[in-house]
């Protein structure tokens, strides 16, 4: 492994550049993926980062992704809850830090969230961030205001978890 390549800082994308990538025509996706892979290798090397995922909201998603147990239409035998027990969330966060994992990912089923729900999530993020944990969320649609609230709470990354 070439560790020198791991020390380089990857360039950031502007909002317009990110939107242009999202608008990539299907026939150009393979070339885009190839380029993304070469950039990943250039800036991150041949490394693996280990994350832990806490299912913070389970089931009752309004989306109807046929393969997904989180869908409200799914007959899968899963636990369904609006919020995972806070102790579980914080225990998982401790695990990330105790074992020097790369990131704590918080997954939430659902398409949209109220501002009150986002504030509750932000409260939990602030508490976990006190330990210096790198945090990300796999979450549905957010308003610009909601994204700012989560960022200000200390969230490092957002993954849009919706599919069609």
Where are the predicted features?
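N-terminal pre-triad scaffold of radical SAM enzymes
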Residues: 33-73, 81-105, 156
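Alpha-helix N-cap/helix-start motif
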Residues: 29, 61, 114-118
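A structural signal for short hydrophobic/aromatic patches embedded in well-ordered alpha helices
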Residues: 18-21, 32, 121, 150
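Glycine- and other small-residue-rich loops at beta-strand/loop junctions that grip anionic moieties
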Residues: 21, 53-54, 139
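Auxiliary Fe-S-binding modules of radical SAM enzymes
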Residues: 1-30
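Conserved Radical SAM active-site core
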Residues: 14, 74-164
